[in-house]
Swiss-Prot record:
Active site: D186, H226, S386
Cofactors (names): Ca(2+)
Gene of this entry: PCSK9
Activity regulation annotation text: Its proteolytic activity is autoinhibited by the non-covalent binding of the propeptide to the catalytic domain. Inhibited by EGTA.
Sugar attachment sites: N533
Name of this chain's protein: Proprotein convertase subtilisin/kexin type 9
Domain Peptidase S8: 155-461
Length: 692
């Protein structure tokens, strides 16, 4: 050790000692190992830094993400997400390599947590100057700066103590959720409150940031307020929804109702590990919080959902598009907006419930009575999308208790199907969000009898494509759902149609913007169709006066949807696509210069038919609905000279939108016809006849 090679210099001893203190999990194990050798550890770190055998794969570039809302950012703490197949040992080695390379450059780092079980990666405290270095490490997929998440109820100082409004004998659900366990990620809770005593287990999990401000006092009743109230809404004895459900609480929000993305991630990882160690029945995770859009938080929710866990979250209280927030924007999460006693959107001062295509449904969220942390028998009213999400978590617990084998897709479809329809005043929402926001208020199903034979479908909107000439938008169904039809919508009316195509082993709906257009939406009709065999048949432009035609030619396959798009554009000289099954219900007919696509499915007992409704004079909106017992699977338009903006499904109704009638004239040539394809299960029809 007395001589130093000119090619390899030793680090100063004080720096090495400091580095050992900050090495994180790997370093801690080395320090605790009585046989560990100080010099060997240093040499190992130097070797890992200098040896660059594990270079990043060619053609792959790690990306950096941070919250779009600057006040919510937490610079200096980063979640490093590694590629999906990365093992724990590789995660730890990557973390050590980052520390070694940072130390050589004179930077100190601290590994706060190594993720394992939910997603591979680690949480590191380091200077932002090291981001470029970290992004070049092997196995790194992307890095996200940590950010804040917040409880989604009004502040505690606006609450008012109220005597209980409900009596136990007034609300008797068919199943209390006794077979379901609900995890609540929130503040601490007052577990000895009479509403939830014996129903909630407080875990030892806690990952919260320090409270803001030096004068903040951690008064127990304020620290427990949000979590106690929500636990009471979910399963309280008097004011709870699922009175039989058991709960486990994890503390991820501090006394001010503030947490972090990283703390929430570690909480979700805790749930996944608990699930693996001790498998139980159906699990519901309630996330009554919101932060800025987070790729890593959405990814963690996706992993947990695909492990069979139902996640329910608050849409957010920012009177904004829910797609801008996480976890509300995660497709695998059931996102809930808030309504009041009149089924209208909740207003909270200058703000209010979030809205938009990422919201699945709404639920009661204003002046909700629940357990108060002020005393063990006190009640309080609180408002917000947290309370709305708690209602849906309770409903989900009861539905899962009645049918424990339900998948997330089946549960979501049932929640939508049994909701109260078209009761919300859409004028409250911004004009550009009205068509995207579901007009649904959650309700308990009257009975699960016969639901297994019901054909459930929902409408999924894509994000807006943007205005560029070749822009496209893509709408996707959940993994357990079948895409039965595809349509498109453009506020300017300039679009090149839509088509169904395979992507990643699943069919997706892709819509095409047109020259001079302002952007387009793709609209997927996603259905539960067990044992289905579905395919898309395409006919290229026929260039014949009779138009382009395509049909379901396979034996036993029925037509569930039609779509059409232009391969090239002729600056608007083409007519809009004509989609009309004529004569037999298994044929799509379109313009001779368009490609026509038919969605054809074979499933036990499936039968379909076509319904049309036309208005001789031009109208801004034309609709046609399927009868009771039938489910809308396809929605398209048969236009004349009117400029059709698009067609889309709202519940069981096909809606065709056109330009303002003042710009289209009033001749019969401007007539528009809405074309619906309605399907049902013969098993359900037979069961209904037997009941009658």
């Amino acid at each position: 050790m007395g001589t130093v090679s000119s090619r390899r210099s030793w680090w100063p001893l004080p720096l090495l000692l400091l580095l050992l203190l900050l090495l994180g999990p790997a370093g801690a194990r080395a320090q605790e190992d009585e046989d560990g050798d100080y010099e060997e550890l240093v040499l190992a770190l130097r070797s890992e830094e200098d040896g660059l055998a594990e270079a990043p794969e060619h053609g792959t570039t790690a990306t950096f993400h941070r919250c779009a809302k600057d006040p919510w950012r937490l610079p200096g703490t980063y979640v490093v997400v590694l590629k999906e197949e990365t093992h724990l040992s590789q995660s730890e080695r990557t973390a050590r390599r980052l520390q070694a390379q940072a130390a050589r450059r004179g930077y100190l780092t601290k590994i706060l947590h190594v993720f394992h079980g939910l997603l591979p990666g680690f949480l590191v405290k380091m200077s932002g100057d090291l981001l470029e270095l970290a992004l070049k490490l092997p196995h790194v997929d992307y890095i996200e700066e940590d950010s804040s998440v917040f409880a989604q109820s009004i502040p505690w100082n606006l609450e008012r103590i109220t005597p209980p409004r409900y009596r136990a004998d007034e609300y008797q659900p068919p199943d209390g959720g006794s077979l379901v366990e609900v995890y609540l990620l929130d503040t601490s809770i007052q577990s000895d409150h009479r509403e939830i005593e014996g129903r909630v287990m407080v875990t030892d999990f806690e990952n919260v940031p320090e409270e803001d401000g030096t004068r903040f006092h951690r008064q127990a009743s304020k620290c427990d307020s949000h979590g106690t109230h929500l636990a009471g809404v979910v399963s309280g004895r008097d004011a709870g929804v699922a009175k039989g459900a058991s709960m486990r609480s994890l503390r991820v929000l501090n006394c001010q109702g503030k947490g972090t993305v990283s703390g929430t991630l570690i909480g979700l990882e805790f749930i996944r590990k608990s699930q693996l160690v001790q498998p139980v029945g159906p699990l519901v995770v309630l996330l009554p919080l919101a932060g800025g859009y987070s790729r890593v938080l959405n990814a963690a929710c996706q992993r947990l959902a695909r492990a069979g866990v139902v996640l329910v979250t608050a849409a957010g209280n920012f009177r904004d598009d829910a797609c801008l927030y996480s976890p509300a924007s995660a497709p695998e999460v059931i996102t809930v907006g808030a309504t009041n006693a009149q089924d209208q959107p909740v207003t909270l001062g200058t703000l209010g419930t979030n809205f938009g295509r990422c919201v699945d449904l709404f639920a009661p969220g204003e002046d909700i009575i629940g357990a108060s942390s002020d005393c063990s028998t006190c009640f309080v009213s609180q408002s917000g999308t947290s309370q709305a999400a708690a209602h849906v978590a309770g409903i989900a617990a009861m539905m899962l208790s009645a049918e424990p084998e339900l998948t997330l897709a089946e549960l979501r479809q049932r929640l939508i199907h049994f909701s109260a329809k078209d009761v919300i005043n859409e004028a409250w929402f911004p004009e550009d969000q009205r068509v995207l926001t579901p007009n649904l208020v959650a309700a308990l199903p009257p009975s699960t009898h016969g639901a297994g034979w019901q054909l459930f479908c929902r409408t999924v909107w894509s994000a807006h494509s943007g205005p560029t000439r070749m822009a496209t938008a893509v709408a996707r169904c959940a993994p357990d759902e079948e895409l039965l039809s595809c349509s498109s919508f453009s506020r300017s009316g300039k679009r090149r149609g839509e088509r169904m195509e395979a992507q990643g082993g699943k069919l997706v709906c892709r819509a095409h913007n047109a020259f001079g257009g302002e952007g387009v939406y793709a609209i997927a009709r996603c259905c539960l169709l067990p044992q289905a065999n579905c395919s898309v048949h395409t006919a290229p432009p026929a260039e014949a006066s009779m138009g382009t035609r395509v049909h379901c030619h396979q034996q036993g396959h029925v037509l569930t949807g039609c779509s059409s798009h232009w391969e090239v554009e002729d600056l608007g000289t083409h007519k809009p696509p004509v989609l009309r099954p004529r004569g037999q219900p298994n044929q799509c007919v379109g313009h001779r210069e368009a490609s026509i696509h038919a969605s054809c499915c074979h499933a036990p007992g499936l039968e379909c038919k076509v319904k049309e409704h036309g208005i001789p004079a031009p109208q801004e909106q034309v609709t046609v609905a399927c009868e009771e017992g039938w489910t809308l699977t396809g929605c398209s338009a048969l236009p004349g000279t009117s400029h059709v903006l698009g067609a889309y499904a709202v519940d069981n109704t096909c809606v065709v939108r056109s330009r303002d009638v003042s710009t289209t004239g009033s001749t019969s040539e401007g007539a528009v016809t809405a074309v619906a394809i309605c399907c049902r299960s013969r098993h359900l029809a037979q069961a209904s006849q037997e009941l009658q």
